[in-house]
Amino acid sequence: MKNRTLISLVSLSLITACSSNTPEFRNVSVHDPSVIKVDEMYYVFGSHLASAKSKDLMSWTQLSSGVDDGNVLIPNVTEELSETLRWAQSDTLWAPDVIQLSDGKFYMYYDACRGDSPLSAMGIAVSDKIEGPYKDKGIILKSGMAGPGDDGEKYDSAVKPNVVDPDVFFDKDGKLWMVYGSYSGGIFILGLDPRTGFPLPDQGYGKKLLGGNHARIEGPYMLYSPETSYYYLFLSYGGLDANGGYNIRVARSRNPDGPFEDSEGKAMIDAQGTPGKLFDDPAYSPYGMKLMGSFQFMNTEDDPEASGTGYISPGHNSAYYDDKSGQYYLIFHTRFPGRGEEHEVRVHQMFMNKEGWPVVAPHRYSGEKIGKYTAKEISGGYAFINHGKDITADIAGSKPIELTADGKITGAVAGTWKLAGDHTAELTINGVVYSGVFLREWNEAAGSQVMTFTAASAEGVSLWGSQE
């Protein structure tokens, strides 16, 4: 679901390099960023026709923002997409996705929604160039109608999907799919024609993967890992605003159309709300591995003034796997402590733990590569964050712990830790084992390189640590 109330301000902040070892960041506002790489350039496309590009995933340039005539992506958007906007009773567009098909053209899957109901339409616009201009090819799906839906059955908003939040992808065998949906009847997947990008015939809304009964689950994104041979379905739970408890989760399957399971082996098709109840979060919050929610690394007496850092309601992510370097990236928008509804794009590196589940680096990506570390480098004091499993607007604040030289964890939590191989991390806290990695990365707030860890349990809880 997209932010309708916020006029997405271009929030540019440049952190200039004061030495060759200091990364340079330029921040942009693109809500619900969907990533595509073209000619060594990364592009993100988001709600309200916002877009940006970057060569390094750190320094971004804003390309567009606002559903207004003159937007470089669709210059005459109010006329070009008038049918979609009329149907959805909206003056803006929600999260799109862009993919390049075999004809070399770029296909934008756009959508609009009324917002207080699933009255939505989704269509395709095509361009010869990634930066546009895009020309409309027509609507492919509608939802929220009073009568029969696109599948010929009476539209029931608790059962049928809200046709927004598309992610279009090729599977490992070259078949084209679209996963989509927000709240309402859940997350669905459709097979697409790889030549035209349009849905294959006789599918209706496609196959349901999870959700329903107005469960607050949306923003699906699929990533295949040749390393594990799994399809990873990323999802956002909760509400997108600063008080909504937005958080990022993941499930996996051997097949693009499921069935999907979480890290406990629970079937994601059961992740749904209670019939007759609206937004019954406790019914589905136990499902899906939670990668990240609202958090804050708290200041200590030794920190620079106001160096505490954190995110509020991070979510609606996309992801990218670099088959040359073997690196994974998580791209998402987030709000920030004390900054209201202002949002920016962030990129964090991801890693697969020994169980084949993604874990997310605690700090934003700054060009780091994982290395070989020693126990001596790792031992010391850390700011520790437990992301938990619930859907909550509460901020998970860091607590002090120490990884002692003899393999113990002391402080706010107690347990043991060990380093295996070059960088594999294993932490045991209260009898629960968390698997992940150690990683040296840039702490933007402190202005220095620090050792970190990221790990997750079979119960789907993620832990972070950042050395103090």
Locate each region found by the language model:
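Low-complexity intrinsically disordered segments
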Residues: 2, 12-13, 448-451
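Bacterial N-terminal signal peptides
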Residues: 8-16
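Carbohydrate-active catalytic/glycan-binding domains of CAZyme proteins
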Residues: 18-468
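Bacterial N-terminal signal peptides that target proteins for export
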Residues: 1-7
